[in-house]
Regions:
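Phosphate/NTP-binding elements of NTP-utilizing enzymes
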Residues: 1-133
């Protein structure tokens, strides 16, 4: 049992064994980190191991999968640690919807024995926060 708990707390193991993504051609596949994602993951883990708060600004990164790996890390932290809440803010309602659907797919594809309990079902409209310009 201790080995299983240790593996579930290992973010890379958890992400690559339990989380799934939807590809551009709409296939559902296990999330396997690409080299750029792996570099970002390594930087984040180094900062965490050093006890530093992780603050990363990524400028103009498109189609590298950075949002996916960040979302996967947030999901892992949220479902494997007690009293952890995460928040992602997107620049548009379309981006918010995309991130919400990614998170929902992570949850839906988890083995039932690993799914955290939910107080209530969330809908996309629950997650969109209006903002003033």
């Amino acid at each position: 049992m201790k080995e299983l708990v240790a593996k579930l707390r290992d973010a890379k193991f958890y992400i690559e064994h339990f989380l799934h993504i939807r590809t551009k051609d709409q296939k559902i596949v296990k999330l396997t980190m690409k080299p750029a994602q792996q570099r970002l993951y390594d930087i984040i883990q180094r900062e965490r191991a050093a006890g530093k708060p992780v603050r990363i600004v990524i400028l103009k990164a498109r189609q590298l999968g950075f949002s996916t790996v960040i979302e996967a890390l947030f999901f892992h932290d949220t479902v494997t640690r007690q009293l952890v809440e995460t928040l992602i803010i997107a620049h548009s309602s379309d981006a918010t919807t995309k991130l919400f659907r990614m998170n929902k797919l992570f949850f839906d594809m988890l083995p039932k024995s690993l799914r955290p309990m939910r107080k209530r079902k969330r809908r996309i409209r629950d997650c969109a926060v209006p903002y003033a310009v």
